[in-house]
């Protein structure tokens, strides 16, 4: 789903509007371009993070990949996305949210070593403005404090002997 200002738009309505018009009625073309760029950078950072995990040795491969994509796209787009630090990916096991944390940014120190059998949710969250966020009273909806756009892409993966299997992609992440 998408929240535009105070308007909630379902995934179906958003997709239908995009297919029918190629644009969202009432949205400035520059703003629409920036939103598409933010979405593309976030999606690209997800796939770069997954590729990093496939060849990396530690969970820090995610933060390295996300930061690299953000920096490279800043040069292309003329603006740099902010990496939301308050929400991160996580391990999945007997509960949905478990250690280890899967950070979308670099930190000093050694992070967990990747081991076959680990299942992780990798979920970069980027913003067009400040990275500060707030959670609504429903305890689910999160917004940026400055009201700027944010984007979130996510996949769950299993670390295998041969790399990764993208559990939430129909093709396992092969494409």
Where are these regions (language model features)?
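Active-site neighborhoods and metal-handling regions in enzymes and metal-associated proteins
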Residues: 1-18, 22-175
């Amino acid at each position: 789903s998408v929240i535009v200002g105070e308007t909630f738009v379902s995934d179906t309505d958003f997709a239908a509007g995009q297919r029918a018009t190629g644009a969202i009625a009432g949205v400035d073309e520059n703003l629409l371009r920036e939103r598409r760029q933010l979405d593309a950078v976030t999606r690209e950072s997800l796939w770069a993070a997954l590729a990093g995990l496939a060849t990396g040795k530690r969970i820090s491969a995610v933060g390295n990949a996300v930061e690299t994509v953000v920096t490279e796209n800043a040069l292309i787009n003329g603006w740099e996305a902010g990496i939301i630090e308050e929400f991160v990916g996580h391990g999945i096991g007997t509960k949905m949210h478990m250690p280890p944390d899967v950070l979308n940014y670099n930190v000093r120190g050694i992070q967990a070593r990747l081991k076959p059998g680990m299942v992780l949710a990798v979920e970069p969250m980027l913003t067009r403005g400040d990275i500060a966020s707030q959670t609504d009273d429903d305890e689910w909806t999160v917004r940026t404090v400055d009201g700027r756009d944010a984007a979130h892409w996510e996949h769950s993966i299993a670390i295998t002997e041969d790399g990764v299997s993208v559990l939430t992609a129909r093709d396992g992440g092969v494409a």
